[in-house]
Amino acid sequence: MRVNNRYVSFYYENDMDMGEIVIDKKKTALLVIDMQHVFITRPVYENPTEEQKKEAQRWEPFYQKIDQVVVPNNAKLLKAFREQGMEVCFAKIQCQKKDGSDRSLDQKATGYNELLLPPGTPSAEIVPELAPMEDELVVTKTTDSVL
């Protein structure tokens, strides 16, 4: 399957099983998923402990990739879709209830996935560079997966 010939690895050079992909502007949408402060903005510590400094250093390559590749590429896609009048949709994790009682079991459990993002929480908002415009769909979900 190839969308175009510019970004096809030589591995797929002769793969024509799926043929050309035709993008029908009326049937195609861009779905931007979880581009929220809580996931893609570096945490800020007032007086970081040594452990927090080490953890920040460990995560720095991730945040650099977010800043230099993920956000700019999402912004380019958003611009292109909007200029073409194509549908743009967003999905974000956020509770519907302030106490978070509607969260998934994963996000209620303690540990890695524990997350409480009630309505109005700044960290739940989509970063400004990728923010939805008026009349764009935003689906609020209470767990990690959107599909």
Predicted regions and their residues:
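Active-site acidic carboxylates
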Residues: 1-132
